[in-house]
Amino acid sequence: MNVRERCRRLWEDPGPRKDRSPFALLLEVFSLFYRVGVVLRNDFYDRELFRSVRLPCRVISVGNVTAGGTGKTPMVILLARLLKDLGYRPAVLSRGYGGKGKAPVNIVSDGASILMSPLEGGDEPVLIARSVPGIPVLTGSDRCLTGRNAIERMGADVLILDDGFQHRRLFRDINIVLLDSDRPWGNGFLLPRGPLREPPTRALRRADIVIRTGGMHNRTSGEAAGTQVETGDSGAVLLRSSPIFRGIHQPCALISLDGGRKMDLQYLAGERICAFAGIGVPEQFRKTLESLGAEIVEFLAYPDHHRYDSSDLAFIERTAKEARAEMIVTTEKDEIKLAPMEKLALPACFLSIEMRVKPQKSFEHLVLEMMKDG
């Protein structure tokens, strides 16, 4: 078992101090140093010893307090569509994690066409560009620089930061923070012993809007001030004055890898499925398929941002055939990396999912009011 896999298992501990192995204790020491560094950095920004850069347009950040998937990319897509439909000229700025484009500014999409592959631009930026045609998508480590390029070269009047909550160098008008409903703080530890990027109590003071995603799909969170957010692990509760909404990952369609034919979601009911995913929380994908009535005979979980090759596809096909699967299903994020490869022998599809925020009208109204007041 490699270091990454051992860390992942520690992060999935049901309790913060279940594993007391030497490896876990060593990571706890590293987490203490990390905590000191991140707290000092945030204090410097809070006291304006470090200054944030203001750009001449509105800036909205979408992020979270843990490493891993909470639905940031679907949320960015939702916001980009909303703002575009209302007549704004949004551009998305991403770190471009996993992409090979290392220039100071990488233009994944100029709004007219997609200019980079997932290998060059990163999985999420290409997915965003494909999902919202007509908006620029740029990557680079310096969001101030990519933001200026989006404004000056592409006419953007609002910037959306994908995974930008901790990037405090660029001032933002709205901070949207996504929390996993089941385990908002993971195992309670900061990196690298746990998935927390910063102490949550301090982090949520900067949040303007909180969205609870994943799990408990039939529950509705209130949007009024003072809504409770439970850790799910220690039972601690944070009371926030920020509005809290419910984010639901809504399956929309089943789309074939061969030709892009759309199929009704009911097609999955009773089907023997071999599913695979290389995303932040693959288990959530499995639960979604099961909720649609699929019989999952094999489920293959790959690391987030995994780069598939021919041997991976051969293994997936062989596994599916041995399990007598009738169909292979993956995520849209994984599908964009399969396009250049040979076709799978079995029928293969990807599940298209969109973010829905409830109550929708209240959320849209609040974002627009904050845009005007910013």
Curated annotation (Swiss-Prot):
Per the record, its GO cellular-component terms are: plasma membrane
Entry annotated with the keyword Cytoplasm: no
Give the residues the record marks as binding ATP. T66, A67, G68, G69, T70, G71, K72, T73
Report the catalytic activity. Answer: a lipid A disaccharide + ATP = a lipid IVA + ADP + H(+)
Q: What is the lineage of its organism?
A: Bacteria, Pseudomonadati, Thermodesulfobacteriota, Syntrophia, Syntrophales
Q: What is this protein called?
A: Tetraacyldisaccharide 4'-kinase
Q: What is its EC number?
A: 2.7.1.130
**Pathway(s) it belongs to:** Glycolipid biosynthesis; lipid IV(A) biosynthesis; lipid IV(A) from (3R)-3-hydroxytetradecanoyl-[acyl-carrier-protein] and UDP-N-acetyl-alpha-D-glucosamine: step 6/6
Protein family: Belongs to the LpxK family.
Q: Where is the signal peptide?
A: none
> Which molecular function GO terms apply here?
ATP binding; tetraacyldisaccharide 4'-kinase activity
Q: Which domain of life is it from?
A: Bacteria
Q: Which GO terms describe its biological process?
A: lipid A biosynthetic process; lipopolysaccharide core region biosynthetic process
**Enzyme class, broadest EC rank:** transferase
> What does the record give as the function of this protein?
Transfers the gamma-phosphate of ATP to the 4'-position of a tetraacyldisaccharide 1-phosphate intermediate (termed DS-1-P) to form tetraacyldisaccharide 1,4'-bis-phosphate (lipid IVA).
InterPro entries per the record? LpxK (IPR003758), P-loop_NTPase (IPR027417)
Keyword annotations for this protein?
ATP-binding, Kinase, Lipid A biosynthesis, Lipid biosynthesis, Lipid metabolism, Nucleotide-binding, Transferase
